[in-house]
Amino acid sequence: MKYESKKLKSSIRVALAAAVTALPMTVFAAESGEIATYDLDTVEVVGQRPVSQPVETVEEPAEETPNVYAGGQIARESSLGVLGKRDFMEVPFNVTSFSNQLIENQQASSVVDVIVNDPSVSNLTLSSVSQAWLIRGFKAQQQDTQINGLYGVAPRFYGGIEYVDRVEVLKGPGALLGGMAPNGSVGGTINFITKRAEKEPKTSVTMSYGAKSQFTQHIDIGRRSDDGKLGVRVNLYNNKGGTAYQQERVNTHAGYIGLDYTTDRSRTTFDAGIISNRVDNAQYRLRFTDDAIKKLTSPPHVDINSKFGAPGTFRQITEKFGVLRSEYDLDKNLMVYGALGMRITHQDTLNNFFDMQNPDGTSQVTYRYNNQINKAYSGEIGFKGKVDTKGVDHELNVSANYMHYKRYMNQNQFPKKIAGKTVNGKPYTTSIYTPEWKDVSSYLGPLVKRTPLNDTKTLRSIAVSDIMTTNDGRWTFVLGGRYQQIVVNDIKKNTTYEKAKFSPAYALIHKMNDKVSLYANYIQGLNQGEEVTDTKAPNYGDQLDPYVAKQYEFGAKFDLGKVATTISAFSITNPGKITDPKTKIVSAGGEVRNRGLEWNFFGEPKKGTRLTGGMMWMDARHEKTAGGKNDGNRKEGIPNFAAVLGVEQDIHGVDGLTLTARMTYNSSAFVNQANTIRVSPWTRWDLGARYRFNVSDTPVTVRADVYNLFNRNYWRALDENAAFLEAGRTFMLSVSADF
């Protein structure tokens, strides 16, 4: 044992040294906005072209790995926090794990590009400057994603997935499974499973061109040691040019490294990344003022290339993160594990708001400047043990989680005033149909960068769970709970929020046979309660207890060998802050109640024909609103019905050729709580093709996709009295070679 321990420590030191050595290759001067350059020795590439051999075509891989379902688009296993890794048929929750094959073949560049394959997910993203979505009708953002099950260390603003092998989507709250999300998302959890070196050496180069004028280069390299114990995976990524939105440009440079080391009794991984991302002239949402809401019933009809983001706006971010995770088997029935991660984010952003005031298109433009440094530290420690009792096997888990945020921030909302007098940045009037913009540099004046400590947040929790399975494996019961503590210090207000909450969960799954599983669960989600800030409220200054979202869910899963399908029905309630119209007392209320029915399917029913998709029926309502004014109204931003159908078809007459199609449909949705402005239903079609062949024994794949094929001009409903104009028809072309 001592020898193995020394060997493990030595290998970890070697792995960490490799990480430190590799990462500087992609370091750049992000803070100054300039990219560092490096002079490399001359690299000679020697190749030999075959004289008379024709190009050899190849078919899609015929067999899938055991962890991927038929068709290769969905992984069988998911990582579910205290439940560990489990097959989807053995999980009493609705979870989908999108594979790297789907990510590559759909040319997905962001997390949203992947998760919109699920109809339970609605896109709230604003062009290239934000990553946001709804899961089962509740909002979540990039800040609430996990990396290998750990909150707080994923890039805070950047949603790229160059280093990601799988994107796991848990639908529904998950307080027991992974703790409270940093920003309090309760509708579901997105978990990134990072890439690992595979058994065979990998060197993949991908060149892409698309959107307006966007050029991308991506290098993916993986190697394992001779004994297979140590693996290294490196991803280098560069992206620059015009996006799908008018005048918007992006410039991204990123590097990632993933290490793993395995022995007979231990498994250790380390992931690190550094990202520089700049977006100029971003597209923004259209907001509706109270006056406009009184006069409008739908968003205005505008040209598909209309622009609501002002010229001269920008967002510059630098993200650095690292995650170390390790497991050690004390014996065959007891394992200890731990994880440690950190992230540092620098952000410098100037954005604008475009507020429509009248049906004639009269609008107002205002600006906001924000620069911040965000630091996060996250950790987890625990043990899992197996105990066999008469008739029932127990899998016990005890874990403790810790996360600490520090935010240094300066935010200026224009107009800027000194001694009550407007100095610069006064709101100006324009038109939604023919917008005229002010010159930002002269209009706003110099932007002052300073980052005083603004606030801190600490999340601590302890979770205990017992997974009980009958000896025949037919019944599994999950019983557990998490004690969550929330401490928030607002430096500017000189206030402290400190509350705690116990969150229980119960679940069961019954395997009727190898093909059918029935399940049910009750689980909660947690979010920080708010402070009463209304000075007229009798309880001014009080801190509301943490908000508790509660979910009841029932479902069935069917594994038919080549096709799998899941059906689930759920009800989620989530409170908010409400003011009593008579007493003026502020309390937790204003409940949102979402009830839904989900149907998902995936697989390869016939060789060469692959399917993914599903349907979602949602009844999302406001309840317990102030004075009952909006009781029964539909929750804004959520369609009653959504559907996604993705099809891939191999053309057997042309080896290596595959045609693809995806249809996305959303029914109408409201943008305001009073339900007076409705966005029309919309359907979007995406078509594509890929061709796989060999050149001199080198596998090559050419992919071409057209998004929004029919150039559909449509609005996407958001919350907070806003809508977003989607991009018109765009394309993406790429060539990948595996050496």
PLM regions: where:
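Acidic, small-polar-rich N-terminal luminal/periplasmic segments of exported/outer-membrane proteins
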Residues: 41-200, 554
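Gram-negative outer-membrane beta-barrel transporters
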Residues: 471-474, 571-573, 588-673, 734-738
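Membrane-embedded beta-barrel scaffold of Gram-negative outer-membrane proteins
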Residues: 327-329, 335-341, 345-351, 545-624, ...
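Surface-exposed extracellular loop regions of Gram-negative outer-membrane beta-barrel proteins
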Residues: 278-291, 404-409, 509-553, 558, ...
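Acidic/polar loop-and-plug regions of large Gram-negative outer-membrane beta-barrel proteins
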Residues: 241-243, 258-329, 342-374, 419-450
